[in-house]
Amino acid sequence: MSDPNMDLNGRVYAITGGALGIGRCLTEELTRRGAQVALIDKEADTGRALAEQLKREGGNVLFVPGDVAEEEALQNFVGRTAETFGGVDVLVNNACLHRQGLLTPCGYEDFNYVLRVGVTAPYMLTRLFLPYFRKGASVINITSTRAFMSQADTESYSAAKGGISALTHAMAVSLAGRVRVNAIAPGWIDTGAYHDPAYRPDYTRADAAQHPSGRVGTPQDIFRAVLFLSDGENSFIDGETLTVDGGMTRRMIYTGDEGWAYTV
């Protein structure tokens, strides 16, 4: 298993959606361990503030404002990253969003916007970064357990996550011998503290108990998974999806089990 305190000095990570949530955690943790980080996010003020904070701490960070749903923004991100760092060791396709589904309803433009952010952008960025990937480079796609299970009215997000999951194994085969491509499927990850510094979680006993691990996930859980998959010592892992959900999707529950009932 990769050491979460490993020195990443000189390694270049490119992260989409790197200003908030899981992406912010990755940006902070990787930079503080010596990695050079390029991030893109449409939250321009938040992204700039994060980059400036990390630079004051001695980090080497490039923030590029932009919406990954737009091809021009993707090209600009790749160009700026290559110009600043020369090459890339790890691309983390993290950005996504949801705009509900059939019951809301989610219309044509909204549905396609989610797919552009969650599927088209990862494909295009991988393609655009190809000339700049260094030896032993890897792509890590952030999918979700919602790629293979759902709640009602989540079609836009589920479709995007299903798409990036399929894209992962397809790209791994296409880039065999050049770039490893893997995915991480988070379950319930509480990102509140990476949106609001004053946030304090307030979980019920059931919130924790529904996870066989006995707790709700944190962005650091995903950070550790990113370290693991991007470690060159784990080069035999390719085209795989690593589920990080505390075992939640492995628990089978029928109505009447463990005091649980389905309301109809």
Q: Which functions belong to the PLM regions below?
A:
Residues 2-5, 149, 238-264:
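Short C-terminal tail/terminal secondary-structure segment
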Residues 7-38:
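Canonical Rossmann dinucleotide-binding motif of NAD(H)/NADP(H)-dependent dehydrogenases/reductases
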Residues 102-103, 107-112, 207:
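Substrate-binding pocket helix/loop in short-chain dehydrogenase/reductase
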Residues 126, 160, 168:
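Active-site helix of classical SDR
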Residues 144:
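Residue(s) in the substrate-gating loop at a strand-loop-helix junction
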